[in-house]
């Protein structure tokens, strides 16, 4: 079976070179940018495609009759392709879980601290010649509410507890070591709310206008999961009114975020470029697992 890594970017190329082994299955690597409409030409003749967050529209994949497997480098394949439609066409989508739990959790905590102390704004102002110290929020003893206690959420809870925060969580099933609360209680009590849910039809728009209104006034929101978990218009309104003090966001409804987007212009928002999972350690584990999936398929 022929395999291709269709979008190996400049960051991943050196990592790929480190993890690939002589006895691994042959996988062609494309490092050149491509337009979406070029996808059928790029995938022509391949049975397996490794995809690092490139969009895979069903109508374009349908023009690739040999393609039977897509190995998505991460968990959120549904944000980049219609998994059910592809399955109906005989294309199986494989995802990779657990590789970046610690990386994403650490980034979540970093955004929380940056938001609490307004670090990004002070950095911008100091570089521009403005010296205006900002009064921040001390996190010791504050309540961290973790919504979604999968691998990442549990890591966020563990680190939050380690820096002296009181941690409560909301999850559909019980998780050892994290006190649970009903959602309304969590939203009302939490000084910081961390979104760590998987995006699906049930969780899309989970943090709605009504639920944002139930948040503790002046709370911080951190989202390193998926942008579509949060009602964007309601979030912007809450940031403008001050009901949400600050948001630390790594994910957005549309990526990349355009510079004229309202969130990009707000002083009380700290932004990163969907990079929470991007550490050398996580990337090495991710690529190694992807290669192992190709090996299993090709047997």
What do the PLM-derived regions correspond to, one by one?
Residues 7-8, 15-16, 87, 92-107, ...:
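C-terminal helix-to-coil terminal segments
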Residues 55-60, 172-262:
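Rossmann-like adenosine-cofactor binding region
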Residues 1-48:
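N-terminal glycine-/charge-rich "phosphate-binding" loop or analogous flexible N-terminal tail
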Residues 41-48, 65-67, 188-193, 216-219:
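Short acidic/histidine-rich motifs immediately flanking catalytic phosphotransfer sites
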Residues 121-155, 177-181:
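Glycine-rich NAD(P)-binding loop of Rossmann-like domains
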Residues 47-123, 137:
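Phosphate/diphosphate ligand-binding glycine-rich loop within oxidoreductases
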Residues 67, 140-143, 209, 218:
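Phosphate-coordination loops involved in phosphoryl transfer and adenosine-cofactor binding
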Residues 5-6, 72, 144-146:
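Hydrophobic Val/Ile/Leu positions in short beta-strands of Rossmann-like dinucleotide-binding domains
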């Amino acid at each position: 079976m022929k395999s291709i890594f269709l979008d190996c970017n400049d960051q991943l190329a050196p990592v790929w070179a480190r993890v690939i082994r002589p006895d691994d299955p042959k996988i062609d690597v494309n490092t050149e940018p491509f337009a979406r409409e070029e996808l059928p030409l790029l995938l022509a003749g391949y049975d397996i495609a490794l995809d690092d967050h490139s969009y895979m529209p069903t109508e374009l994949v349908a023009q690739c009759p040999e393609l039977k497997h897509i190995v998505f480098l991460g968990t959120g394949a549904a944000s980049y392709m219609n998994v059910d439609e592809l399955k109906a066409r005989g294309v199986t989508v494989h995802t990779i879980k657990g590789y970046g739990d610690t990386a994403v959790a650490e980034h979540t905590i970093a955004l929380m601290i940056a938001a609490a102390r307004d670090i990004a704004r002070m950095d911008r102002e100091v570089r521009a010649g403005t010296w205006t110290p900002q009064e921040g929020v001390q996190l010791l003893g504050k309540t961290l509410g973790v919504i979604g206690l999968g691998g990442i959420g549990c890591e966020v809870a563990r680190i939050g507890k380690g820096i002296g925060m009181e941690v409560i969580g909301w999850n559909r099933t019980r998780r050892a070591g994290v006190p649970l609360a009903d959602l309304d209680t969590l939203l009302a009590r939490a000084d910081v709310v961390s979104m760590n849910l998987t995006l699906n039809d049930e969780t899309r728009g989970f943090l709605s206008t009504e639920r944002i209104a139930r948040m503790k006034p002046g709370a911080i929101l951190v989202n390193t999961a998926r942008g579509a978990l949060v009602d964007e218009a309601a979030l912007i309104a809450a940031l403008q009114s001050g009901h949400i003090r600050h948001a630390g966001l790594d994910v957005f409804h549309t990526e990349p975020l355009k510079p004229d987007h309202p969130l990009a212009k707000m002083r009380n928002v700290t932004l990163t470029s969907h990079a929470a999972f991007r550490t050398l350690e996580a990337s090495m584990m991710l690529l190694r697992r992807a290669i192992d999936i190709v090996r299993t398929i090709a047997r």
